[in-house]
Amino acid sequence: MLVGLVTFAAIPPIVTGPMIRGPIVFGTTYAGEDVDLTPERVTLVTSDGLELAAHWVHVHEPAAVVVFVSGTHGPSVTAFFGHAAMLAEEGYASLLVELRARGESQGERIGLAYDEVRDVRAAVAHVQTRLAYASVPIVAFGLSLGGATAINAAGVTPAIDGVVSLSAFSSWSEVFVDNMGLPEPFASVQRAFVDLYLGFTYGFDRRDLVPRRQIERLGSRPALLIHSRGDTQVPFASFERLAAHAPAHVETWVREGDAHLVVADGSFLRPWEDEAYASTVMGFLGRHFGR
């Protein structure tokens, strides 16, 4: 019994410790010019003093500003320049934010959607300093850990007017145990030890800062949850938990197969080529934020 508990306690730091060690150096990054954009490079400063690399894609009289954030170890948020180009065609501005400890952004530790909430809040604060974007709705759009961060940030940031989340986890402890494939009651025991590790690492005062709980705080704000049914990185159970806890009006779209990036293979920089995906995202934005 004691040996088993020690094993359960040892697994979270052994597995998660190396995963959260930064900074992450991306093998591939993209430029706005790859999709005929001329972005404005800016630096954001978080409430804990980190400088983050970010890229504006401006449009005239924007219908909304979409703040993009990416995943745990990639891709770089610059992969979303294609999304920004697609959105610009329909009158949406974009702010692409490289999360802490990744690429050109400062930081030494991946925050597992706890610390990264500060990054999204820094983006919101920056948008609010731009006179051209006064009173323009702000939409948080994230992939994987970025999707979890977008949900968490919306839960604690009333200035975020909407959310688009791709392949988000419902909580780190839940996706951790989902990927282990443990049956009950072992899964519950392991989750408890993962939560204990997260408390010591990120603070026990943040135990409610998880997407499954923060999505309940959306109120009437629109949100779109997207996931692939066979996702092997963030299993579909996370999507099911998020959908179960979301307000009734929250929209969902499920892609069959294992597609963690959701967009059809080879089309992430050109998302308009994936017509089903593009129409889902643009339809959601148009219904809630279009002119």
Give the positions of each predicted feature.
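An N-terminal hydrophobic leader/cap segment in hydrolases
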Residues: 2-45, 55
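Alpha/beta-hydrolase active-site loop
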Residues: 111-131
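Hydrolase active-site cap/lid region
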Residues: 152-204
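Short beta-strand/loop motif that positions the catalytic acidic residue
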Residues: 218-219, 225-227, 231
